[in-house]
Amino acid sequence: MAVYKEAYPVDILEDDAEGYQAAAEAYYEMLREGAQTSAEVISLSTGEQVRLETSSLCFCTIYRDEPQHKILGLVNPQDTKTVVAVYLKESWWSIEDILRTSDPTREGLMKVQSFGERIVLFVLNVIVFGRLERRLHIDDMFFLPHPAKEQAKILWKDGAAVAFYSVKMKGSLCGDGTGTCYLLPVLDTVFVRRKNRCQGLGTAMLRDFCDTFQGDEALGISCPISPAMYRVLRQFLLTCPGERGRLWEVEPPGAWGQQRVNIWLKVYLQERRLQDGSTVHPKCSEEDTDTPGQASQEDGPTQFNHGESHKEWAVGEPERTQNGRRCAQVCEEARQV
């Protein structure tokens, strides 16, 4: 393994999740039994100091489908739902340090493979996306960890993990208890950190997703899609018109009919409504990219509710809808734009 001047967890962690968990449990028991002569203190980025006591520690589930795998986290005493540091390799690491790397070759979009990369994905998704950078006054949801074998890529930039996206593979189980499988690859979660938005990273991940599955005629985006993500999709499809017929907003398993809506068609119809003055266009940033694919309003691993999608115009193949002629006409107009 390469040795770096200042290594971070993703650079040095071996694929030994059980070993790290056992060490964390032993450390926790030591604190609980008061084996240390004096309590350790960790300084937060805010300047606040937190004493390492069992009341400030919690074990966090790393994988949604394997709840036995956990890591030890230190919570903010002012907000006990927010983890501010994680115990790994017999040391405490701040959230920002977990997202850093000293490996110069770790740049751009890279597939999540190692245990260290799974930890980075967990921190980005559950801690940063789910707590630190969400709009608390708008959204009461928190975000569930990805499954252990979830296909995902992390976008590394200037020595830090700044974005990620995850994919439900064609043929993988939908996870709804019915045994049904996805009928197409589906982009499930997308996130760009606030300080890295408006830099084209969202469209770059969409392009990578489409390029990765070039052999598939149809690709899905998990429903519901946020207005911010729709703006990113609009920009992407304006730049890459060849992808307009491939991208669909889908509900599992993504069958034709009431489970697929063509994204470009929805964009086109929205703009027609704007031209008619029937819809107020929200003024927002170009790339406020966050699409929660796994969210819950209650504690514990609950099934993701895909929400409501408006399908009154076009769902799946136009000729199969009740308003077939009208929808087919609009589809043809959208293709020509």
Swiss-Prot record:
Residues 278-326 are annotated as: Disordered. Residues 307-322 have a biased composition (Basic and acidic residues). It comes from the Eukaryota. Residues 291-306 have a biased composition (Polar residues). InterPro entries: FAM169. Belongs to the FAM169 family. This is Protein FAM169B. It comes from Mus musculus (Mouse).
